[in-house]
Regions:
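A hydrophobic, multi-pass inner-membrane permease signature
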Residues: 1-219
Length: 219
Protein backbone atom coordinates (compact mmCIF):
# COMPACT_ATOMS: atom_id res chain seq x y z
CA UNK A 1 0.00 0.00 0.00
CA UNK A 2 2.81 2.37 0.83
CA UNK A 3 4.55 1.28 -2.39
CA UNK A 4 1.43 2.05 -4.43
CA UNK A 5 1.24 5.51 -2.86
CA UNK A 6 4.91 6.15 -3.67
CA UNK A 7 4.50 4.89 -7.25
CA UNK A 8 1.57 7.24 -7.82
CA UNK A 9 3.27 10.21 -6.14
CA UNK A 10 6.69 9.81 -7.79
CA UNK A 11 5.12 9.17 -11.20
CA UNK A 12 3.14 12.38 -10.81
CA UNK A 13 6.25 14.37 -9.88
CA UNK A 14 8.12 13.13 -12.96
CA UNK A 15 5.20 13.22 -15.39
CA UNK A 16 3.69 16.55 -14.39
CA UNK A 17 7.08 18.23 -13.87
CA UNK A 18 8.59 17.23 -17.22
CA UNK A 19 5.46 17.75 -19.32
CA UNK A 20 4.51 21.04 -17.65
CA UNK A 21 8.02 22.47 -18.03
CA UNK A 22 8.15 21.60 -21.72
CA UNK A 23 4.63 22.85 -22.45
CA UNK A 24 5.09 25.95 -20.28
CA UNK A 25 8.31 26.85 -22.11
CA UNK A 26 6.65 26.45 -25.52
CA UNK A 27 3.65 28.55 -24.50
CA UNK A 28 5.86 31.24 -22.98
CA UNK A 29 8.50 31.54 -25.70
CA UNK A 30 6.85 30.52 -28.97
CA UNK A 31 4.04 32.09 -30.97
CA UNK A 32 2.10 29.47 -32.89
CA UNK A 33 -1.40 29.04 -34.24
CA UNK A 34 -3.85 28.07 -31.51
CA UNK A 35 -1.61 29.18 -28.63
CA UNK A 36 -4.24 31.32 -26.89
CA UNK A 37 -6.89 28.71 -27.55
CA UNK A 38 -4.72 26.06 -25.94
CA UNK A 39 -4.16 28.26 -22.89
CA UNK A 40 -7.88 28.84 -22.56
CA UNK A 41 -8.58 25.14 -22.95
CA UNK A 42 -6.20 24.23 -20.13
CA UNK A 43 -8.12 26.54 -17.80
CA UNK A 44 -11.44 25.02 -18.90
CA UNK A 45 -10.11 21.50 -18.33
CA UNK A 46 -8.84 22.43 -14.88
CA UNK A 47 -12.28 23.83 -14.01
CA UNK A 48 -13.93 20.42 -14.47
CA UNK A 49 -14.25 18.52 -11.17
CA UNK A 50 -12.58 15.14 -11.49
CA UNK A 51 -15.76 13.40 -10.37
CA UNK A 52 -17.50 14.51 -13.59
CA UNK A 53 -14.86 12.70 -15.67
CA UNK A 54 -14.86 9.35 -13.85
CA UNK A 55 -17.10 7.50 -16.31
CA UNK A 56 -15.08 8.65 -19.34
CA UNK A 57 -11.82 7.80 -17.59
CA UNK A 58 -13.17 4.34 -16.75
CA UNK A 59 -13.76 3.51 -20.42
CA UNK A 60 -10.33 4.88 -21.38
CA UNK A 61 -8.58 2.71 -18.78
CA UNK A 62 -10.58 -0.35 -19.80
CA UNK A 63 -9.53 0.25 -23.42
CA UNK A 64 -5.87 0.63 -22.42
CA UNK A 65 -6.13 -2.57 -20.38
CA UNK A 66 -6.88 -4.50 -23.59
CA UNK A 67 -3.63 -3.39 -25.26
CA UNK A 68 -1.02 -6.18 -24.95
CA UNK A 69 1.86 -5.23 -22.67
CA UNK A 70 0.81 -1.65 -22.05
CA UNK A 71 -2.45 -2.71 -20.43
CA UNK A 72 -0.62 -4.58 -17.69
CA UNK A 73 1.14 -1.38 -16.63
CA UNK A 74 -1.23 1.48 -17.47
CA UNK A 75 -4.63 -0.19 -17.60
CA UNK A 76 -7.52 -0.50 -15.19
CA UNK A 77 -6.65 -1.62 -11.65
CA UNK A 78 -2.94 -0.78 -11.94
CA UNK A 79 -0.82 1.78 -10.10
CA UNK A 80 0.45 3.04 -13.46
CA UNK A 81 -3.10 3.62 -14.68
CA UNK A 82 -3.95 5.58 -11.56
CA UNK A 83 -0.77 7.65 -11.97
CA UNK A 84 -1.65 8.32 -15.63
CA UNK A 85 -5.08 9.63 -14.66
CA UNK A 86 -3.70 11.77 -11.83
CA UNK A 87 -1.03 13.24 -14.11
CA UNK A 88 -3.66 14.17 -16.70
CA UNK A 89 -5.82 15.88 -14.08
CA UNK A 90 -2.89 17.89 -12.68
CA UNK A 91 -1.33 18.97 -15.98
CA UNK A 92 -3.48 22.10 -16.63
CA UNK A 93 -2.46 23.71 -13.33
CA UNK A 94 1.16 22.62 -13.77
CA UNK A 95 1.35 24.10 -17.27
CA UNK A 96 0.01 27.46 -16.13
CA UNK A 97 2.34 27.63 -13.15
CA UNK A 98 5.41 26.79 -15.22
CA UNK A 99 4.42 29.26 -17.93
CA UNK A 100 4.29 31.95 -15.26
CA UNK A 101 7.84 31.17 -14.16
CA UNK A 102 9.13 31.08 -17.76
CA UNK A 103 7.51 34.47 -18.42
CA UNK A 104 9.65 35.96 -15.64
CA UNK A 105 12.94 34.74 -17.15
CA UNK A 106 14.83 37.34 -19.21
CA UNK A 107 15.13 36.81 -22.95
CA UNK A 108 18.71 38.15 -23.21
CA UNK A 109 20.70 35.04 -22.30
CA UNK A 110 18.36 32.80 -24.24
CA UNK A 111 18.59 34.89 -27.40
CA UNK A 112 22.39 34.93 -27.18
CA UNK A 113 22.46 31.14 -26.98
CA UNK A 114 20.06 30.80 -29.92
CA UNK A 115 22.17 33.19 -32.02
CA UNK A 116 25.25 31.08 -31.21
CA UNK A 117 23.51 28.05 -32.69
CA UNK A 118 22.10 26.29 -29.64
CA UNK A 119 18.88 24.37 -30.16
CA UNK A 120 15.66 25.19 -28.35
CA UNK A 121 15.90 21.96 -26.36
CA UNK A 122 19.46 22.70 -25.26
CA UNK A 123 18.53 26.26 -24.27
CA UNK A 124 15.59 24.94 -22.26
CA UNK A 125 17.70 22.32 -20.49
CA UNK A 126 20.96 24.19 -19.83
CA UNK A 127 19.92 27.83 -19.52
CA UNK A 128 16.25 28.20 -18.62
CA UNK A 129 15.58 25.29 -16.26
CA UNK A 130 18.39 26.20 -13.81
CA UNK A 131 16.78 29.62 -13.40
CA UNK A 132 13.38 28.23 -12.39
CA UNK A 133 14.51 25.54 -9.95
CA UNK A 134 12.32 27.00 -7.15
CA UNK A 135 9.29 26.67 -9.38
CA UNK A 136 10.13 23.11 -10.33
CA UNK A 137 10.70 22.19 -6.70
CA UNK A 138 7.44 23.76 -5.57
CA UNK A 139 5.48 22.07 -8.36
CA UNK A 140 7.11 18.77 -7.43
CA UNK A 141 6.01 19.18 -3.81
CA UNK A 142 2.43 19.97 -4.79
CA UNK A 143 2.16 17.05 -7.20
CA UNK A 144 3.76 14.66 -4.71
CA UNK A 145 1.24 15.61 -2.03
CA UNK A 146 -1.62 15.27 -4.50
CA UNK A 147 -0.54 11.77 -5.45
CA UNK A 148 0.33 10.79 -1.88
CA UNK A 149 -3.13 11.74 -0.56
CA UNK A 150 -5.19 10.67 -3.60
CA UNK A 151 -8.38 8.83 -2.71
CA UNK A 152 -11.18 9.37 -5.24
CA UNK A 153 -9.37 8.16 -8.36
CA UNK A 154 -7.62 5.14 -6.75
CA UNK A 155 -10.83 4.10 -4.98
CA UNK A 156 -12.79 4.28 -8.24
CA UNK A 157 -10.37 2.50 -10.55
CA UNK A 158 -8.93 -0.25 -8.34
CA UNK A 159 -10.40 -3.53 -7.12
CA UNK A 160 -9.46 -5.34 -3.92
CA UNK A 161 -6.58 -4.52 -1.62
CA UNK A 162 -3.59 -5.31 -3.84
CA UNK A 163 -3.64 -1.91 -5.56
CA UNK A 164 -4.91 0.08 -2.57
CA UNK A 165 -2.89 3.07 -1.44
CA UNK A 166 -2.62 4.55 2.06
CA UNK A 167 -5.80 6.69 1.99
CA UNK A 168 -7.86 3.70 0.85
CA UNK A 169 -6.28 1.49 3.50
CA UNK A 170 -6.97 4.15 6.12
CA UNK A 171 -10.63 4.24 5.08
CA UNK A 172 -10.87 0.44 5.18
CA UNK A 173 -9.64 0.43 8.78
CA UNK A 174 -12.74 2.36 9.80
CA UNK A 175 -15.42 -0.24 9.13
CA UNK A 176 -19.16 0.25 9.66
CA UNK A 177 -19.72 -3.13 11.30
CA UNK A 178 -16.42 -4.26 12.85
CA UNK A 179 -14.78 -2.46 15.74
CA UNK A 180 -12.20 0.10 14.67
CA UNK A 181 -8.67 -0.26 16.02
CA UNK A 182 -7.94 3.41 16.56
CA UNK A 183 -4.30 2.73 17.43
CA UNK A 184 -3.68 1.41 13.91
CA UNK A 185 -5.72 4.23 12.40
CA UNK A 186 -3.66 6.80 14.30
CA UNK A 187 -0.37 5.15 13.29
CA UNK A 188 -1.29 5.01 9.59
CA UNK A 189 -2.64 8.56 9.67
CA UNK A 190 0.54 9.85 11.28
CA UNK A 191 2.69 8.02 8.73
CA UNK A 192 0.66 9.55 5.90
CA UNK A 193 0.99 12.98 7.50
CA UNK A 194 4.81 12.98 7.51
CA UNK A 195 5.26 14.32 3.93
CA UNK A 196 2.70 17.05 4.63
CA UNK A 197 4.61 18.18 7.72
CA UNK A 198 7.88 18.22 5.78
CA UNK A 199 6.14 20.26 3.09
CA UNK A 200 5.02 23.01 5.49
CA UNK A 201 8.35 23.14 7.31
CA UNK A 202 10.72 23.33 4.35
CA UNK A 203 8.77 24.87 1.44
CA UNK A 204 7.34 28.18 2.65
CA UNK A 205 9.59 30.21 0.33
CA UNK A 206 8.73 27.94 -2.59
CA UNK A 207 5.05 28.63 -2.03
CA UNK A 208 5.74 32.36 -2.26
CA UNK A 209 7.64 31.76 -5.52
CA UNK A 210 4.68 29.84 -6.92
CA UNK A 211 2.39 32.76 -6.07
CA UNK A 212 4.65 35.31 -7.73
CA UNK A 213 5.11 33.09 -10.78
CA UNK A 214 1.39 32.53 -11.12
CA UNK A 215 0.29 36.16 -10.91
CA UNK A 216 3.10 37.96 -12.77
CA UNK A 217 3.26 35.82 -15.89
CA UNK A 218 1.82 37.29 -19.04
CA UNK A 219 -0.17 35.76 -21.86
Amino acid sequence: MTLNSFIIAISMVIGVGSTSSLAGYALSRMNFIGRRGFLSMTIVLHAFPSVTLLISIFFVLRFIAKIPGIGLVLGYNTAGGIALVMISLDLPLGIWLMKGFFDNVSWDTEQSALIDGASRLRVWWEIILPQIKPGLAALAVFTFLTGWSAYLVPATFTIGTQMANLPIYLNQLQGDTALTNWNIVAAVGLFQLVPVLIFFIFTQKLLLNIYSGGVKGGV
